[in-house]
Amino acid sequence: MKHLLLTTIAAVVLVGCSKPPPPNISIHHAAVHGNIEAIKQHLAAGTDVDAKDAIGWTPLHVVADNGRKEIAELLIAKGASVNTQAALGLTPLDLAIRFRSNRTEIADLLREHGGKTGEELKAEG
């Protein structure tokens, strides 16, 4: 009986301490659609906050392009790099200011956290 109790307790502890599985939607797809709950699930499951898609976009690139400030704040709080460059050297800030003139709140947020454009990074060497 004592062995069964210890085994049960150990199983409960192991299950309770494991990471939850990521959702059935990619972190990039969740970012496109503003699905903050799926993003949170990905991060809790250990998905890389700076995971790149086929063209080198991170989730932060996606939300900067789509105007998802709340998700941008979450990703930055979880350690997302604000200066990761994708294809053509584009950073999340490039996407917030060049292609979407109404993304000033996200551009300001990125700047507050050290965000730079690809051209600024290139000039720094």
Region spans (language model):
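Ankyrin repeat boundary/linker residues
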Residues: 53, 86, 121-122
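Positively charged n-region of N-terminal signal peptides that target proteins for export
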Residues: 1-4
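Ankyrin repeat domain, specifically the short helix-to-loop turn at the C-terminus of the second helix
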Residues: 40-48, 73-81, 108-116
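C-terminal motif of bacterial Sec signal peptides marking the signal peptidase cleavage site
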Residues: 15-16
